[in-house]
Amino acid sequence: MLSKKFTLRSHKSSITYIYPHPTIPSNVFTADSSGLIINWDLTIRRPKSSWQAHTDTILTISTIENNNSNNNGDGDGDGDGDYYLLTHSRDNTIKIWDLLKFSCLLEIPCNSLNFTNIEIFNDLLFTPSSINSNNLDVYKINPKNWQIKRLIFDFDIYKLVNKNENENGNIIQEIGSDTITNNRNDFGIIMQMKIIKTITTTTTNTTTTTTKENQEENGGDFIIYLGFESGDIVGLQLILPPARILSTTNKSTNTNTNTNDKTIIYNQSAKFILKYHNSFHVPNPIICLSNLNSILISSSITNKLIIHYNPIIEIKNLKYSGIQSIVYFKKFHQLIFGYWNGYIQYDDILIKQNLPKLGTTNNNNINNNIDTDINQEQSKLTKKLTFMTILNESKQEISQTSTTTTTTSGGDKSKYSSLIKSKRNFKLPLLLVGYEDGSIVAYNI
């Protein structure tokens, strides 16, 4: 069941993203439509910090890791890894932040004419094309020096699907429509992106193995799924050809030491291959893509939910149309749905947050039927749900508590007791739900 635990109130604009801290399970980042980000400590239910990251709606929050940096950028001072926050906004920028200083390390111009998110996998960044919202750009970010290189520019997904459709011997997983175009000559703008990890294998005469080199050569063991305005969903695999390295080394005749060492690295062009295509949602635009234990889930403006067991799909009819958010509760292998109308559905449980109601009167002289109609209409007014995420249980919570316990001085017994009490009251997993009024409600699951 879902039980309301607490509410966070500091945002004055609609919540647009909630992102768990990469190393501290009790901390989350929340963003709103004004571009403000707040870092919360859920054990005390107070903001730790906040900053104006952008000038418009924040559409995506993620992290990028730098394993070779000497500066810990995760902002908690515990030396547990160099994580940096990545944010994406409708102000046409992507920014990477040092969480110790809240300073911007890198700013990337981007296309935010539509409402799609962006995706990042290791050091690979996927965004709508800078010149065409129907197409895709891919960048490679070097976190050592924050240099960025564009690997793929303005990739036309529609042309790739058409090409594979017309080539003999290639099978496209297209389900739910007789034609891929549906009387259109494109798929429209990209509405949603979702990266889902897969298993990349190589086959020998006797064994099948997975290696780091194989994964790097193929750009990583993942597929990026794109949901379009047309209702089409396309899955792509990125192929990164192996680097060709030319080394020249000159040694001194007297010292046997290197005096000149050059290494030249160059790649062939990266490319995409088509792995999946589904058009069941056509002509309704895709509004949500989610990950069900490495299986894609999709929804549009209708009440249809599609589970993509490639190449088979399962269709579920949900209670309401317009699914704003889908989260997967791993512990019980359950899906939780958040609808446009403000309802949350978990199994057979339905929850809503009502808007404040006007006072009513019990004066018997007023027509009772009119009062009843007014009350019924007011009861339909619910807060508009805008985002959901789950904070799952983690071993890091235990290590964090232990570290804090051992470093607390004996003279701060009252603070220590309060901290331990707050941690006992903070129980994972939690469902965090953001609303249009800027509030964030936490539910125990």
Swiss-Prot record:
Superkingdom in the source lineage: Eukaryota
Keyword list, A-Z: Chromatin regulator, Nucleus, Repeat, WD repeat
GO-annotated biological processes: chromatin organization
Entry-linked PROSITE patterns: WD_REPEATS_2, WD_REPEATS_REGION
Subcellular locations according to the entry: Nucleus
WD repeat ranges per the UniProt record: 10-50, 53-107, 406-445
Location, primary (coarse class): nucleus
SUPFAM superfamilies: WD40 repeat-like
GO cellular component assignments: nucleus
SMART domains: WD40 (SM00320)
Family: Belongs to the WD repeat ASA1 family.
Described purpose of this protein according to its UniProt entry: Component of the ASTRA complex involved in chromatin remodeling.
Assembly notes: Component of the ASTRA chromatin remodeling machinery complex.
The protein, known as: ASTRA-associated protein 1
Organism: Candida dubliniensis (strain CD36 / ATCC MYA-646 / CBS 7987 / NCPF 3949 / NRRL Y-17841)
